[in-house]
A protein has these predicted regions:
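Glycine-rich FAD pyrophosphate-binding loop
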Residues: 43-63
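Helix-loop-beta segment of a Rossmann-like dinucleotide-binding subdomain
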Residues: 110-120, 145-174
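Extreme N-terminal leader/targeting segments of oxidoreductases
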Residues: 1-25
């Protein structure tokens, strides 16, 4: 099924890899995570090549809900139990900072985005209550929705206001312009650890560059 994001955004095609290519870092996978990783490295002066077995952003990214949020399920009650209040706070801050950096990229490239409240629903009122308490304990603004407008029965939903939804393929299109990308280039084998690393695909060979 063609995703909603493809209706108004077509990504450019990239050649398949043939022959031998040398690079400092090879990024395997051309979703948003791979594109952002490659860009971060390139911005720091690293020679990067990205390979994708199909087309970039054709799998998970193409069908994502495109949320930029620090709320990833009912996790903060679990984090407090496992790594403590300080660790849970650091987790939130790291994700909030990453969200701001991603929104800054969207603003820089003129990618459409919209501020929205993010919600996580559950059939357990106890779990929702525990999560709401955990968020408040960490000083995270949180809200409770008694009857979320969903086509299924729930016990409510816990939300964090001021999160964001964006157009993932329009961001990917801008990121891809700056990168060396090979599509239809699935990696079949990795050879070597630490030194003389190689990634092998049919009819091609990627090797770690050696610079003096």
């Amino acid at each position: 099924m063609r995703s909603v994001w493809h209706r108004d955004s077509l990504l450019p095609e990239h050649p398949a890899l043939t022959g031998e290519v040398r690079t400092d870092v090879l990024v395997i996978g051309g979703g948003l995570a791979g594109l952002l990783t490659a860009r971060e490295l390139q911005q720091r002066g690293v020679d990067v090549v990205l390979v994708e077995k199909d087309r970039i952003c054709s799998a998970t990214t193409a069908h994502t809900t495109a949320k930029i949020t620090a709320q990833h399920g009912l996790i903060y009650q679990k984090l407090i139990r496992s790594i403590g209040t300080e660790g849970a706070t650091q987790y939130y801050r790291a994700n909030a900072e990453a969200a701001e950096r991603l929104k800054e990229l969207c603003r820089r490239f003129g990618v459409p985005m919209e501020e929205k409240n993010n919600f996580v629903y559950s059939s357990s009122r106890q779990k929702l209550g525990d999560e709401l308490s955990a968020l408040h304990k960490l000083g995270i603004p949180a809200i409770f929705e008694e009857s979320p407008p969903l086509p299924i029965s729930t016990a409510g939903a816990v939300g964090i206001p001021g999160q964001t939804q964006f157009h993932p393929l329009k961001l990917a299109k801008h990121l891809a312009k700056e990168l060396t990308i090979y599509e239809n280039s699935g990696v079949m084998e990795l050879i070597g650890i630490y030194y003389h690393n190689r990634a092998i695909k049919p009819y091609a060979d990627l090797r770690r560059a050696h610079k003096n």
